[in-house]
Curated annotation (Swiss-Prot):
Cross-referenced Pfam families: FBPase, FBPase_C
Pathway: Carbohydrate biosynthesis; gluconeogenesis
Enzyme Commission numbers on file: 3.1.3.11
Taxonomic source organism: Methylacidiphilum infernorum (isolate V4)
The name this protein goes by in its record: Fructose-1,6-bisphosphatase class 1
InterPro entries: FBPase_C_dom, FBPase_class-1, FBPase_N, FBPtase, Fructose_bisphosphatase_AS
Length: 356
């Protein structure tokens, strides 16, 4: 066992010395790290712990899993005590959580999804936590919802923790993306994946193909061309994936490239996008761009969008840059009338597995 590992704490100390972050931001990241360790322990217990919690319907209109509630409480209790925050926003809370007056008024705002992909818990698949850090107002005015409604370009830090066979903590401070693996024996995150980079091209994409009939023509065009493989216009074979866990999809893309799509569709006209802008799309977009990838709605960069509400949903296309750029071009072609209505359903009159 090496005693000279670069731990997350040492890494943050180095970033402080380089002037990348200040001591308060470093301390906040350490608090988030601690929260994620507790969540990892809770997730690993599964039904052993979740039987004890009463569940309700959250602000999204979704039934909370017991571990959703537990993870949210862990983040609240640990992060409010560090004196670095003014407030927090979570997927599991309708309105901002204002730090109680007994704590020092901090310089930062924390936005987080305490347990992304929690629908996978019942089948024991990968879940994770996502977080984003913004600068808090300095004027001394009371903290309000509007202070959280800022474009993703203003993020100071973002990351996610993957609770899989190993626990991974992925972090960007705006100067690249780095991955840390939890050594469970000693309870320390150690740098194992420095300077993670997303390959510009790929042969792999992830999308929920059961929604094909609701997709816009540019997305159907893209997927159809990928499925045609070597015999189609792309001239290469693709693999299709779908885990239903954004943290797992993005981690795979960071490791070996790829494309993740949860595009705009017509399945529910009140929700043209499915993923949440503030605590899913923005932090993941910051990470992906810092790793050399790209994120878009198909029509604009997600990181440039000014949020309208805390729980705003949005279409998301992210991953290898060349593929995102191609999808942007397909959307532009369609919007400008250069692409005719695409009428080649994947799952109706012909098989995916038959040569055209």
């Amino acid at each position: 066992m090496s005693y000279h590992r670069m731990t997350l704490s040492k890494f943050l100390l180095e970033q402080r010395k380089k002037g990348v972050i200040d001591p308060d931001l470093g301390s906040l990241i350490n608090d988030i790290e601690s929260a994620c360790k507790y969540v990892a322990a809770a997730v690993s217990k599964g039904k052993l712990i979740s039987q004890e919690v009463n569940v309700t319907i959250n602000v999204q209109g979704e039934e909370q899993k017991p571990l959703d509630v537990i993870a949210n409480e862990i983040f609240l209790k640990i992060c409010e005590q560090g004196d670095q925050l003014q407030g927090m926003v979570s997927e599991e809370m309708e309105s901002p959580y204002i730090i109680p007056p007994e704590h020092r008024r901090g310089k930062y705002l924390l936005i987080y999804d305490p347990l992304d992909g929690s629908s996978n818990l019942d089948v024991n698949l990968t879940v994770g936590s996502i977080f984003s850090v913004l600068k808090a107002p300095e004027s001394g005015e009371p903290l309000e919802e509007k202070h959280f409604l800022r474009p993703g370009r203003e993020q100071l830090a973002a990351g996610f923790t993957l609770y899989g066979p190993s626990v991974m903590f992925i972090l960007t401070l705006g100067n690249g993306v780095h991955g840390f693996t939890l050594d469970r024996e000693v309870g320390i995150f150690t740098l194992t994946h420095p300077d993670m980079r997303i390959t510009p091209s790929t042969k792999e994409f992830a999308i929920n193909a059961s929604n094909e009939r609701f997709w816009e023509p540019p997305v159907r065009r893209y997927v159809e061309e990928c499925i045609k493989g070597k015999t189609g216009p792309r001239g290469k074979d693709f693999n299709m994936r779908w885990i239903a866990s954004m943290v797992a999809e993005v981690y795979r893309i960071l490791i070996r490239g790829g494309l993740f799509m949860y595009p705009r569709d017509t399945k529910d006209l009140s929700k043209p996008g499915r993923l949440r802008l503030l605590y899913e799309a923005n932090p993941m977009g910051f990470i992906v761009e810092q790793a050399g990838g790209m994120i878009s709605t198909g029509r604009e960069s997600i990181l440039d969008i000014v949020p309208r509400s805390l729980h705003q949903r949005i279409a998301v296309i992210l991953g290898s840059k060349e593929e995102v750029e191609l999808l942007n071009r397909y959307h532009n072609d369609y919007d400008s009338g250069k692409q005719e209505e695409f009428e080649s359903p994947l799952f109706s009159t012909r098989s995916l597995f038959r040569n055209p």
